C-alpha cells in the first residue's frame, strides 16, 4: 500500500519539469515518495526530517537531506509525511506562493492546530488531502486501482527498495513486535513478518490473539 500511496500522490501533485519539491518526514512513506521522485527532472528535491540519522537513507537514495530549520523555502510542492503538527506547520513555511501541500499523514483521532491566520490566504496556499482508496483525479478515467497496484508491484522490483527493510521477526513474535513499534523501542522503516510455510511449525505457536476467518 505504501508504494500505491506514493504513486497516487505523484499523479495527484503532477510535479513539472524543474519544480522545487520538499518531502517532510523521512519514514517509510516519505522515503518512498523521495525514491519515486529522485529520477524525475526536478529543479530541487529535499528529504526533510528532525532525525539526523535519516540522512543515511537520503544518501542511499542520492537525495539531499535537510533538518526542518535548514530546508530550502519557495517550493512548488511539499509532500507532508511526518504525521505531526510541527511538520505540517513547517510545510506552510516551505511552500511558495500559490504552492500546494499534499497531506499524506494519518492523524486518526488526534487534533492539530495550524497558523492559518497568518499569510495562508494572502499567499493562496493549498493543502490537499490524500487517500489511497481512490485513483488520483488526474488519472481516474484512464487507470483502475488494479492498474495502480500492478504498477506499484513492478516498481518495487527496483533493488533500491531493499534498503527500507530494516528487520524481520517470526509470525509468533508479532504481538511483541507491535508493542515495541508502538512504544518506540523498535526503530524500523519496514519490519518484515515472516509467515511459516504451510504445514510448518517453524515460526512457533500462533499468537493467542490471532483470529482466523
Regions found by a protein language model. Name each.
Residues 14-20:
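Short helix-loop-beta connector
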Residues 23-26, 38-90:
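Adenosine-nucleotide cofactor-binding segment
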Residues 1-6:
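Short, small-residue-biased leader/transition segments that mark boundaries at the very start
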Residues 20, 43-44, 100, 126:
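Residues at the starts of beta-strands that form the adenosine-phosphate
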Residues 29:
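Hydrophobic/small residue at the entry helix of a nucleotide-binding pocket
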Residues 89-154, 195-210:
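Glycine-rich phosphate-binding loop and adjacent beta-alpha segment
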Residues 143-213:
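C-terminal hydrophobic helical "lid"/dimerization subdomain
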Residues 11, 34, 55, 88-92, ...:
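Generic hydrophobic/aromatic pocket-lining and core-packing "Φ" positions
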Amino acid at each position: 500500500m505504501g508504494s500505491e500511496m506514493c504513486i497516487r500522490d505523484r499523479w495527484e501533485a503532477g510535479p513539472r519539469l524543474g519544480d522545487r519539491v520538499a518531502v517532510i518526514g523521512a519514514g517509510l512513506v516519505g522515503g518512498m515518495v523521495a525514491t519515486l521522485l529522485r529520477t524525475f527532472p526536478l529543479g530541487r528535491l529535499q528529504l526533510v526530517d528532525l532525525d539526523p540519522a535519516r540522512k543515511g537513507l537520503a544518501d542511499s537514495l542520492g537525495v539531499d537531506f535537510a533538518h526542518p530549520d535548514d530546508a530550502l523555502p519557495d517550493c512548488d510542492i511539499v509532500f507532508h509525511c511526518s504525521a505531526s503538527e510541527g511538520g505540517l506547520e513547517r510545510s506552510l513555511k516551505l511552500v511558495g506562493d500559490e504552492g500546494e501541500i499534499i497531506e499524506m499523514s494519518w492523524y486518526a483521532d488526534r487534533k492539530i492546530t495550524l497558523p492559518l491566520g497568518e499569510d495562508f490566504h494572502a499567499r493562496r496556499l493549498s493543502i490537499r488531502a490524500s487517500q489511497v482508496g481512490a485513483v488520483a483525479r488526474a488519472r481516474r478515467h484512464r487507470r483502475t486501482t488494479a492498474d495502480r497496484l500492478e504498477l506499484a508491484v513492478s516498481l518495487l522490483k527496483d533493488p533500491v527498495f531493499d534498503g527500507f527493510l530494516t528487520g524481520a521477526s517470526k509470525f509468533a513474535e508479532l504481538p511483541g513486535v507491535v508493542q515495541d513499534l508502538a512504544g518506540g523501542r523498535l526503530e524500523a522503516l519496514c519490519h518484515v513478518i515472516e509467515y511459516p510455510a504451510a504445514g510448518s511449525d517453524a515460526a512457533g505457536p500462533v499468537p493467542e490473539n490471532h483470529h482466523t476467518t
